[in-house]
């Protein structure tokens, strides 16, 4: 096995909070932060693919994994690939992850998320008492919002797509870091 840990720009930490003191400003800052993280993640994925022969990596076996903001990044990248957005152009044609593992993640979308293509198999873990990343959804402005693991899995079930969903009852955002810390 080969494990690669990627880094990405964390825009919200670097922005003056006064820039997103209202809902519209926050919505814009959130979308920009997620876009930057996903772009960096895509570039890192592409770098891995470009060096796959040298590093003896099978690009068809790359699994994306993240927790909290990293889970949002991994899920959003898969969502962008499935919807053939400009993000997908950063990657080789027909590339998709072999799977995505998400600890307390969500997808950012304008309106209810729509999947043009079915996603790769997803494994999601989320506490139903999470007040940081929504378990189901958090509409930020009009229809733009974060659509959490519970909502995503309802869609995957309807699409009859491969997924596993572990609901940690009564657990908050600690599920985003406890598997890495406690195991």
Question: Each predicted region: which residue ranges?
Answer:
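The feature captures the conserved acid-bearing segment of alpha/beta-hydrolase catalytic domains
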Residues: 88-160
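Gram-negative outer-membrane beta-barrel domains
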Residues: 5, 55, 67-69, 150-155
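C-terminal catalytic histidine-bearing segment of alpha/beta-hydrolase fold enzymes
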Residues: 157-183
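Short, solvent-exposed loop/turn and secondary-structure capping segments
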Residues: 15-17, 75-77, 112-115, 134-136, ...
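Primarily recognizes the serine-hydrolase "nucleophile elbow" in alpha/beta-hydrolase
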Residues: 39, 43-118
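Structural recognition of the beta-strand scaffold that forms the well-ordered cores
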Residues: 2-7, 61-65, 98-103, 121-126, ...
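Active-site loop signature of alpha/beta-hydrolase-fold enzymes
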Residues: 11-13, 108, 131-132, 173-174
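Serine-hydrolase catalytic machinery in alpha/beta-hydrolase-like enzymes
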Residues: 1-57
């Amino acid at each position: 096995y080969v494990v690669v840990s990627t880094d990405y720009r964390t825009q919200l930490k670097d922005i003056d909070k006064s820039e997103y003191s209202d809902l519209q400003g926050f919505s814009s800052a959130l979308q920009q932060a997620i876009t930057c993280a996903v772009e960096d993640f895509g570039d890192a994925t592409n770098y891995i693919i470009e060096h796959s022969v040298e590093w003896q990596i099978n690009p068809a076996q790359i699994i994306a994994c993240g927790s909290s903001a990293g889970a949002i990044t991994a899920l959003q990248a898969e969502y962008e690939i499935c919807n053939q957005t400009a993000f997908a152009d950063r990657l080789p044609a027909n590339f998709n992850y072999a799977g995505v593992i998400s600890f307390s993640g969500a997808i950012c979308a304008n309106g209810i998320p729509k999947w043009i293509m079915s996603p790769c198999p997803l494994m999601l873990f989320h506490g139903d008492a999470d007040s940081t990343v929504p378990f189901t959804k958090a509409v930020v402005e009009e229809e733009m919002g974060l659509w959490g693991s519970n909502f995503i899995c309802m869609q995957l079930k309807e699409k009859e797509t491969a997924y596993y969903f572990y609901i940690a009852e009564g657990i908050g955002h600690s599920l985003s870091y406890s598997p890495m810390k406690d195991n």
